[in-house]
Amino acid sequence: MPGKTLNWGVVFTGENLSLDDILRYARLAEDAGAESLWSTELGRDAFVPLAAIASVTKKMRVGTAVATFARPPMHTETAAIAMAELTKNNFVLGLGTAPPAWNENWHGLNVDKPVARMRDYVQCIRKMWTGSLTNPVDYDGEIIRVKGYHRFIPAAYPSVPIYLAAVQTNMLQLTGEIADGLLANLLNTTKYFSEVVHPNIKAGMRKAGRDGNEFEYCTLKVCAVDTDRKRARDLARHTIAFYSTLPYFDIVLDPAGFAGPKQKIRAAFAAGDIPAMLKIVTEDMVDALVLAGTADEVRAQAKKFEGLIDTLILYSPTFAVEEGEAKANHEAIIQAFAA
């Protein structure tokens, strides 16, 4: 069970920030006491920015949040081992499924069994890490099959920790069964963690006979900070509005009482009316789903998650956000959590 002290980190997306910006904020976050830095797979791949971050920071743990399983297992395992070597084993491979429409329309990948595919994906990658020229790897899973895979360079660190992004109960149970940690997605509530996340993670652990003592609970968390609390809360509405359009967040939104606004947001999204989407997001949604307000307020809001998670990964809103706003908020969230 997580303790009462929260580690914090920052996740960088490919939106509204140049690579130079990301490196500047990475150094700023390290100086401020951040424990980890993470990269998404939006606009850029998830690994290259992390390699750059590792080269300009001194001791930061870095991780993908997340790389999707649309990439062939071989490409992911080699990238992960290279990152582990570069960081002296201070890298986390965060994996996720991505929305079904993205897999089908962007990757040409039809995934009708995401949990089975993720199980195969993790097991296959771990087995590939044990391979060599003289010890070829075979993997015969339900979805993924590999035959005679030769690892031309022995893995410098063949036990890279794998964390899974999970929202639904089946994926949460798989995470507890086979992963080293959880990367909860960025719309969540304390109720969701206590009533959905922990029971299902523990069910997966029981299935595998694990005690879970080394398991890390992480969550991406939307964070908007401004001396003007209304401006911060309005900025956070951008991400709430966008992610409320994705059906797999129903498990978070509906029990929290947000089924009605969610449906209206989706109708506005279908009509291409972004201003209407933002207006539909209620004050209660902002209170429950994100960290938003002044620096003092967001630090107090973060304390609600003590005992529920180990690591808070701060995510600056990006959807329909101007570049200047995005840059200012990255600096503000880092300064708000500075030691």
What are these regions (language model features)?
Residues 1-339:
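Active-site-adjacent structural elements that line small-molecule/cofactor binding pockets in enzymes
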